[in-house]
Amino acid sequence: MAVLCIGEMLIDFIGEGVGTIDKVKSFKKEAGGCVANVACVAQKLGHKSYLLTSLGQDGFGDFLENTLKNENVDCKYVSRKADSFTPLAFVSLDETGDRSFSFYFKGSSTLRISKEDVEKVDLSEIEAIHFASIAIQEESKDSHHLLLKKAKEAGVLISFDVNLRFNLWDDHKVYHETIKEFLPYVDVIKVADNELEFLTGTTNIEEALKKDFSHMEVVLYTKGEHGAEVYYENHKVVTEIPNIKAVDTTGAGDAFAGSFLSKLLNHEDLNNISEEDLAQMAKFATNYASLTTTKTGAISSYLTEEEYNNLI
């Protein structure tokens, strides 16, 4: 069984050195994109993975498709669109490795995922689907609905990373309403502390669990340098970030989501997870994500389980 990720793949041009975009003199080209990152993490950790996305018929798209192939992510659901461009992100880093983004995204191939692209998917081989909030607009919105509705009916586990990017949506009210529209599909959600209020209207995760996330199986609540909280039924697990010097946090949240999902799928019975097992999954995901911040780039920083065990 496999993991299918639907949504964006783009190129991160990461500023070399510390400083704002206008101060950076050169950039390093890295493959990235929230859901593409999760596909690569799942593959690294032993799960067959597919990416359902659309890339431009351009050199950037060639680079990204070749990256997926090098990472052994199956590309049979990757389409190429000649009349749109591959999205780009320019990333600047501060002294802590935290990021600021400038995107070339509107009108890009990510928003051209079609219903025909979705119709090609064989759900009988898919155990879990992962998506995020960036691509649920324009043509791709309807395609997400089509896939997730079919997946829900087929009993496929659905994972969602809120991953807010306000500068990619013109109307933030529509952004909020659109995300809420997709929440009924979701079994596993990752939401950051700085995203919770926009999504739920409260800064209190306990309130959000009762009001907005009550139908979900697992809630991953990330708190940056303060670690994470993981909720499953009556269990609550708290993790702390290991003492690691961060160089670049690009893709760390995706590493957390992807590594937790991978461990969750390894569990024999998703309806019966002990607090001890949940704690082990959460600790693995926290440590895995932290280790990826010691290198620049997202996909290029991801580890196999053997590489992880050699470092931890």
Regions found by a protein language model. Give the residues of each.
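Beta-strand->loop->alpha-helix junctions that form or flank phosphate-binding loops
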Residues: 54-56, 76-84, 220
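Active-site metal-binding loops of divalent metal-dependent hydrolases
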Residues: 9, 162, 255
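Glycine-rich phosphate/adenosyl-contacting loop at the front of the ribokinase-like
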Residues: 1-73
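Short beta-strand scaffold segments in enzyme catalytic cores
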Residues: 40, 88-92, 227-231
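Ribokinase/PfkB-type carbohydrate-kinase core domain
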Residues: 1-4, 69, 96-237, 268, ...
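Hydrophobic beta-strand scaffold residues
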Residues: 49, 75, 158-160
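Short, conserved phosphate/pyrophosphate- and ester-handling motifs at nucleotide-, phospho-/glycolipid
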Residues: 42, 192, 253
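Conserved phosphate-binding/catalytic region of the ribokinase-like
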Residues: 149, 205-312
